Amino acid sequence: TFSEQGVRWPFPWDMHAKFTRFVSSGNPQSIFFDVMFLDHKEHEKEFAEAIHDSGNVFLDFPFETEEVHVKYSDIDERMEILNQYRFPVDPDDTKMPWVEEAVPPTPMLARAAEGIGYANIKPDVTDKVNRQLPLIIKYRGFYYPSIDLVIVMHYYGITQDDVEIQIGKYVKLKNIPPEKMAKPSSDRTITIPIDDEGFMDINFIGGPGSFQSYSYYYFAREGKYKHKSLENKICLVAAYSSTGISTDIHPSPYGQLFGIEHHANALNTILNQDFIIKLTPLQNVLIMLVLALLMGILLPRFSIVFSVIFAVVLGLLYVIGSYILFDTMNFICAFTTPIIQIGGTFSFILAYRVLTEQQEKKYIRQTFSKFVSKSVVDELLKDPKMLQLGGQKKILTVLFSDIRSFTSLSETMPPEELVEHLNEY
């Protein structure tokens, strides 16, 4: 429809102004533009007025990981506005920042907005999959909040004084109205777990299209939005298309997702208090120790075939148990290492059993072949427990053979020759 009118991405700012006015008439809780408004453009004043009149528009910006070659003449003014949102650094935080430079929105738009925050996403360095979101970023001796945290603070109606940050542990939101909490508590706080770089784990609810989306074109009009579908909702606006206009796409545990979907999942995680709880390294080590002890005690008592079955079943039970813990309680256990440990422990015990059984059979063969026939030795090798002292009651047929003149014969032969002679019988 836009293409029919000759409108191409990025859309002109007067269209964003029209969109903002129309959506605001539907009384949404927040409007978040995941669109970078970094350069001054035509209709900036009109767009700023629409943002200001709405009173609930949030804009994002990038924290660059390298030095920015494009210099903005008003960067000091931009940073002055951005600094209104910063938090003091935790005294125990000694880590170096991983960002180089901030590029906030234009001052006119930033002042008109209800809040601004960065929109950075940083995939895992090992497999390039994004499972986390930097809730706070350390920059020039302060913590700066992500756009998601800024929106959440607005949703709960709290200020910077109601936020407590302890790096490597949590971001705590305090004095929250109970009626706005998904899981109300007496202390009226929400504790968001973070790592030592300020990253929170995103509890993704699914793959592409998990959140309801609408065409921008429908809302970019004059007039009033008369339906209730936007009322008290957080509306996220971004280039969200399979036609190639959006390059903001990142891998997730559920496949490729647009950047705005990562933010939607992060907001959903916080607002529903569905935080992922990772077991500590010590807890994971204890789990692996229990698995190793269980296998060490039971496997030597089983046959090799039953040992294989037991190891496979134990591995499957661990996988199923880990899934149930995550699905019901949001607990994440170490996954790959315990499975490898089960296989490694089984292989070690199996190798040990094979070696010891071979040594035992070799000892039995060498010892008893001097005294009994080969067939008797073979029977002993089938079941070495037959060597133990004690009687057994069995119905047997016995053949007695008497060697004539054995006494006089034995007196004339050395022991070695006598045994060899007896073995012929």
What are these regions (language model features)?
Residues 103, 371, 400:
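Short aromatic/basic micro-patch
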Residues 258, 262-266, 289, 375, ...:
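Generic alpha-helical secondary structure signal
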